């Protein structure tokens, strides 16, 4: 079972609807319980998400497979961000993965084998692919300048674009759009996003002129661009640790 499998296993039955995942509607009892819990619990981790970014991503083993992604960002400090990734920003989104974002300084401290798993962000910002929905460019400029110098590691755990009604198989490593043939986002996908938010990616390029990427771009990031090799996850059986942790 690998993240590059076209079909990792038996798919849930498809009924021709767009409902993901399959299941019965919430009962009134469940709705009341959810509302009560929301009033009484702090939900502190969720409330730390303070920024919404929308961009695109390519599968690490097949850059021709591209998806729109919505990142909800929690900034732990100036050098580290953690993001919940959804396939849309509607009231019924699907949580499809997580991305960690680190500063150039932290990225350079990583082992080269670890660096292979990370991607840069400067191209998607400079070309207007990454946007801050409903936030004016002038307001977002400083944030975009900061993110352009960072690196990200994005694991996709639910391939809804493939039609999976449930999260199936191994997680897939995702990569950012790049200025190479397979890394350029398909026009139809771009138009759909722009129409949804009433923006023009092409016109954003002008306002992004002068935004710079990392001081020294590391070639271990965006590994598929520089080395022509994709990366996939495989799941194998292994012997379990049979010694008890306590006497």
Swiss-Prot record:
Region described as Disordered: spans on this chain: 1-26
Cystine bridges: none
InterPro entries (UniProt xref): OBAP-like
Top-rank taxon: Eukaryota
Family label: Belongs to the OBAP family.
Protein name: Oil body-associated protein 2A
């Amino acid at each position: 079972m690998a993240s590059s499998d076209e079909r990792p296993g038996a798919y849930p039955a498809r009924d021709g609807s767009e409902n993901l995942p399959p299941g019965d509607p919430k009962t009134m009892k469940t709705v009341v319980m959810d509302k009560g819990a929301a009033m009484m619990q702090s939900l502190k981790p969720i409330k730390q998400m303070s920024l919404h970014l929308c961009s695109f991503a390519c599968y690490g083993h097949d850059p021709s497979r591209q998806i729109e992604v919505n990142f909800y960002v929690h900034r732990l400090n100036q050098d580290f961000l953690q993001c919940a990734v959804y396939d849309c920003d509607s009231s019924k989104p699907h949580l499809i993965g997580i991305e960690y974002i680190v500063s150039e300084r932290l990225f350079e401290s990583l082992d080269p084998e670890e660096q292979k798993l990370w991607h840069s962000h400067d191209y998607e910002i400079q070309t207007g692919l990454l946007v801050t929905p409903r936030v004016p460019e002038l307001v977002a400029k400083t944030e975009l300048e900061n993110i352009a110098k960072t690196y990200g590691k994005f694991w996709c755990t639910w391939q809804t674009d493939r039609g999976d009604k449930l999260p199936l198989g191994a997680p897939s490593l995702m990569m950012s759009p790049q200025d190479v043939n397979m890394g350029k986002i398909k026009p139809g996908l771009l138009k759909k996003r722009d129409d949804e938010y009433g923006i023009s990616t092409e016109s954003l390029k002008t306002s992004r002129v002068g935004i710079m990427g990392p001081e020294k771009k590391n070639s271990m990031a965006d590994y598929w661009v520089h080395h022509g090799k994709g990366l996939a996850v495989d799941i194998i059986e292994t012997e379990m640790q049979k010694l008890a942790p306590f006497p």
